[in-house]
Amino acid sequence: MHSISEIVFQLTDKNLLMGRMVALIESPFEPSEDYVERYKRVTDMSLDQDTVKNLNNLTPEQHRKVRNIIRWQRIGCIVVKISETLGVSLKEALDMFYRSETCRRFHDEETGLYLQGNLYVLNDFLAEIGSPV
């Protein structure tokens, strides 16, 4: 079995870090044979057998760790877009995002914001701060 970091690398290396894939990863973990087929349908692409086996063999705790790693990677992407859009430093963008209601909702799984793509979250943040961009 591969480590959590190897699994995350496999996922990101295959450019699967998009809203639809994150929605599946964030869903409650149900080890079953149809998990692989659901994963393929959601991502619209086939994965190599090693990646599929690794995803299916995760414990619930490991599954949660993968979800959290992906969430933090997404925050980095969102912060870069905030910096570019508003013309502020990365540090300022990070500070702005972490102090926002949008960030709070992004971490709260009950709101469903984490299921949306990075640009959707960015637009929510920009609307929250009243940016005309």
Which sequence ranges carry the predicted segments?
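C-terminal alpha-helical interaction appendages
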Residues: 25, 35-133
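N-terminal cationic leader/targeting segments used for protein routing and processing
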Residues: 15-16, 41
